Amino acid sequence: VLQPVIHPPSLVLARAVTRSLTSAGLSQAVTYAFVDPARLKAMGWDAPEALIALQNPISAERSVLQPSLAPGVLEVVALNGTRQIPDVRVFEIGQTFAPHREEDGDRPAHEELWLAVAMTGLRAPRAWHAARDRIDIYDVKGAAELPVQAAGVGDAETTPYAPGEGPRYLEQGRAALG
């Protein structure tokens, strides 16, 4: 008798998030888990001790494990731009890596499952009858709410920034959402 397959909760959640974002018109990206430390530094990553270097990298540009999904999705946006595709709605669900922590047990590195979304260009596909409105913060906010709903989280409260304050991309080597 075959036993039913029981999927880990993280996989069930990742699939629900993927369905919600693809049904909203975003494309899923699958990028390398190896990134360029110089690119991370250019993006403001100032915690080299939090990077895990590969012993045998495939190239100098792919020599550390990704501490964030942002470099990968931004690389996808840039690559589309070089191919004259300015309207991009992309997301990635993937592992990020940090140095080993006590709670990791036998694992050599700390791994976390993250979601990254990047959107740029026009809101609607280019057509003679379509409005030429550009993607704005409200489009991104709407895309961010989809995975929250897919995860079954109820209404979330948000705290607006005080005048003069705003989100920072990276803070102390951890991704910041804002």
Segments (PLM) and residue ranges:
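Extended beta-strand-rich architecture
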Residues: V1-G178
